Each structure stands twice: as structure tokens, then as C-alpha cells.
Amino acid sequence: MKFFIDTANLEQIREANALGVLDGVTTNPSLMAKEGIKGVENQHKHYIEICNIVDGDVSAEVIATDYEEMIREGEELAALNPHIVVKVPCIENGIKAIKYFSNKGIRTNCTLVFSAGQALLAAKAGATYVSPFVGRLDDICSDGVGLVAQIVDLYQTYDYTTQVLVASIRNTLHILQCAEVGADVVTCPLSAIKGLLTHPLTDIGLEKFLADYRKVNG
């Protein structure tokens, strides 16, 4: 399973990349706004900076919901760097745009997916990735991980090459559950990635090893 970091913060991306386990980055308009990145030109420069840090796919989202504008924005984003994957919302015009981009050889990430039906249409249109949002589904008492498992099964049944890129990861349990059901990728905050390293018995064991070493070696 691949690990992407879900942020537009360059320092967090560098820190995650330094661990040696980072495979890519996902961003969205909210994350860009959080970093104070304003204006299309500055956003494009920021995407290029991210691509220069990580040797992997970087999802950059279109803002438009109109088909023609989606195409224009997506082509501009794809031209920035070969690592760019155009992120498109799972709406009617988005599915049309994904089909267009697929025919042009432009890779896409179909985002804001909350049902197996949406995921099926995204794969049929040729999406490179599909992003089910597990945390947001859990928030409304739905089964986010169950949806991931359903999508994985559907794609295997019909031999779709679309990768399941799980988003809205809230904790380490989400990561492990998604791994167990066969997700291709999880994208999560740095805190969740680092959380996988944490276990109290590891800390206790390390403390004991060091204490025993100091007893013998001073």
C-alpha cells in the first residue's frame, strides 16, 4: 500500500518525505487556503515546489464545476509537471472531464466519492485514482471502510486499473483498516503517518535497553 500525505504545507511534506516512506501528495483548495496560497500563479508555483520535493504523484484540484473550465484548468495543471495528477470532483461534468483527460493521457484523481456507484462511474470514465472519504462517511454514521472494501471488490471483479486512494483519514485505525481491505493508497495527515510509529511498549523497551546499557558502560 502506498502512503500519500494530505497537505499543502511544504515543511510537513519534507518531514514525511525524510521518513523514506512517502509515495505522493494530495492537496485541495481548503489546504491551499490554509497555507495562504492566493492566486492561480502562486498556486501553480506551489504545486511545482511540492513536485520538486517528492518523487511521486501530486494531486492538484480544479476549482471549476463547468466542463469547459474544468478542461482548461486541468490541462494547465497537467502541464506544470509530469507528477501532477488532476483532481476532479465526482459530479456529472467531472466524469465527463475525466473521460476527456483519460483520452488525452492526462492522469486524474476523482475526489469526493461517497458511494460505490460514483466509484464505478469514475473507473469506467478512466480515472487513475478514486478517492472515497472514509472519515466524512463515519461522521454521518455510515461505514467508510466498508465502502472502501466494496470499491476494491468491484474493481477486482471488472479488472479496472483505477487505484483506490482513500482520503479523509482521521486516525491510524483507519489506515490499518484500509490496508486490510486492500486499498491501494491512503492519504493522511503527517500526524497519522507518525502515529503508526507510536506504541508504549516500544518506548518502555527502548528505555530499558538504554538503562541496561548505561549500567554496564557507564
What do these predicted ranges mean?
Residues 155-218:
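C-terminal alpha-helical cap/extension of soluble enzyme domains
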Residues 3-5, 9-13, 19-21, 27-100, ...:
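Active-site beta->alpha loop and helix N-cap motifs at the rims of alpha/beta catalytic domains
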Residues 11-19, 69-73, 97, 115-125, ...:
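Catalytic cores of alpha/beta
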Residues 5, 60-63, 87-90, 111, ...:
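Glycine- and other small-residue-rich loops at beta-strand/loop junctions that grip anionic moieties
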Residues 28, 86, 122, 178, ...:
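Conserved, mostly hydrophobic/aromatic
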Residues 29-33, 112, 128-140, 181-202:
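Glycine-rich phosphate-binding active-site loops on the catalytic face of alpha/beta enzymes
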Residues 20-24, 80-84, 100-109, 124-131, ...:
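Glycine-enriched alpha-helix->loop->beta-strand junction motifs that scaffold or abut catalytic
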Residues 44-58, 95-108, 144-164, 207-218:
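Alpha-helix-loop-beta-strand connector modules within alpha/beta enzyme cores
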